[in-house]
């Protein structure tokens, strides 16, 4: 088993955290792109933030690895390319993140039933009841005050502004 992280600065911390497990640890962009092509690997979980997941996903597809997709940005920036390559290399793409995984699981075995509509729900974000006047004064700090999670600034801002929901809509369109 292997774990690969893009940020080399966190290599020693990760190595220490996993020292009691029989896991090989690699770090760096080149390591990610190379490990996805390794012979003993059947499934590649792509869970990298933003655009960083694109190149490793392409290389994994070209190496005929099943893609367990947890990175919606890969499809947002290059969905047509990823879909074309997956068909060309006969590589399955299995969504493993939240709504898209649930949709995928509901559709297994439903090949004869064409999809008419997929509905993605949204809470409206933390500012859904704000007036236009209140919205004019919202700050980054306000958007980062999520009551339920601490997942980092990018995902918190993307969720608060509903950008993440927009990404999910694009992902659903490409996947289904």
Segments from the language model and where they lie:
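Predominant activation on well-ordered alpha-helical scaffold segments within soluble catalytic domains
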Residues: 15, 33, 58, 83, ...
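N-terminal glycine-/serine-/threonine-rich beta1-alpha1-beta2 phosphate-ribose binding loop
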Residues: 1-51
């Amino acid at each position: 088993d292997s774990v690969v992280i893009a940020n080399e600065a966190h290599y020693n911390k990760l190595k220490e955290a996993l020292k009691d497990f029989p896991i090989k640890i690699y770090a760096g962009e080149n390591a990610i792109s190379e490990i996805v092509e390794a012979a003993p690997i059947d499934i590649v979980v792509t869970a990298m933030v933003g655009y960083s997941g694109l190149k490793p996903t392409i290389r994994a597809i070209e190496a005929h690895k099943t893609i367990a997709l947890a990175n919606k940005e890969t499809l947002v920036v290059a969905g047509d390319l990823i879909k074309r390559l997956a068909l060309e290399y006969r590589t399955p793409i299995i969504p493993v993140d939240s709504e898209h995984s649930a949709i995928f699981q509901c559709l297994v075995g439903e090949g004869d039933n064409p999809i008419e509509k997929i509905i993605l729900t949204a809470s409206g974000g933390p500012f859904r009841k704000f007036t236009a006047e209140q919205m004019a004064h919202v700050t980054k700090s306000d958007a980062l005050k999520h009551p339920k999670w601490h997942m980092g600034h990018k995902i918190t801002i993307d969720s608060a502004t509903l950008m993440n929901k927009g990404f999910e809509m694009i992902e659903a369109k490409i996947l289904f």
